[in-house]
From Swiss-Prot:
The lineage of its organism: Bacteria, Pseudomonadati, Pseudomonadota, Gammaproteobacteria, Alteromonadales. It comes from the Bacteria. Pathway: Cofactor biosynthesis; NAD(+) biosynthesis; deamido-NAD(+) from nicotinate D-ribonucleotide: step 1/1. This is Probable nicotinate-nucleotide adenylyltransferase. Its EC number is 2.7.7.18. Keywords: ATP-binding, NAD, Nucleotide-binding, Nucleotidyltransferase, Pyridine nucleotide biosynthesis, Transferase. Belongs to the NadD family. One of its GO terms (biological process) is NAD biosynthetic process. HAMAP family: NaMN_adenylyltr. GO terms for molecular function: ATP binding; nicotinate-nucleotide adenylyltransferase activity. It catalyses: nicotinate beta-D-ribonucleotide + ATP + H(+) = deamido-NAD(+) + diphosphate. It holds the Pfam family CTP_transf_like.
Length: 216
């Protein structure tokens, strides 16, 4: 099976995560996309709710959207969530699968600062979500990594790993920080959160400020 991997803090998960993943699945003809909540993200100070809550919200999305599954391998880990470590584990557990690691352009531009980033090319393909019409500057040092590995979606794949797909994605102007700020102000940003996530946040009194959450 062709499996997309979308990792993140999902603090909380919102349509800015869900819609691009759906577009990637459609364009690359993936069988599934696995949502993988991080436990301890190496590049962030922490999260605003527990790993259990973020995992539960991801499960709600998987229940609502059949194309998604939840991978809890990082959420259950007590050490930082390094992608190379995770993909090494996944390829051992599921050697029959072909993995596509989904990331945004910001993550790709800082990719060489990731822990053991070179290993990922032996474990999976990279899928970089970009705005339509966006091009990487010819002088950008990432061109040396991108150019020999860039692969067109329409062409057959020669191997189970090592290629980079640049996928045009509908721009989603949704920020987890802004979502949390609204929630802490007592505003439910209903346009960017699935109903199941809104209900979970309300029921569990997450991201609360001084006032009770109200509908936007």
């Amino acid at each position: 099976m062709k499996i997309g991997i979308l990792g993140g803090t999902f603090d909380p998960i919102h349509f800015g995560h869900i819609r691009p993943a759906q577009e990637v699945k459609q364009q690359l003809k993936l069988d599934e996309v696995w949502l993988m909540p991080n436990h301890i993200p190496p590049h962030k100070q922490g999260t605003h709710v527990s790993s259990q809550a973020r995992l539960a919200m991801a499960e709600l999305i998987a229940d609502e959207f059949p194309c998604f599954k939840v991978c809890d391998i990082e959420a259950k880990r007590d050490t930082p969530s390094y992608s190379a470590m995770t993909l090494t584990q996944l390829t051992k557990i599921y050697p029959q699968h072909e993995f596509y690691f989904i990331m945004g352009m910001d993550s790709f531009l800082s990719f060489t600062r990731w822990h053991e980033w070179q290993q990922l090319f032996g474990l999976c393909h990279l899928v970089v979500c970009k705005r339509p019409g966006w091009l990487l500057d010819d002088k950008d040092p990432m061109q040396k990594i991108l150019t020999p590995r860039l692969h067109d979606v329409a062409r057959p794949l020669p191997a189970k790993s090592g290629k980079i797909f640049m996928v045009d994605i509908t721009q989603q102007d949704i920020s987890s920080t802004q979502v949390r700020q609204q929630l802490m102000q007592g505003i439910m940003p209903s346009a960017v959160l699935p109903t199941s996530i809104q209900e979970y946040i309300r029921h569990n009194r997450l991201y609360r400020g001084d006032s009770s959450t109200k509908t936007d």
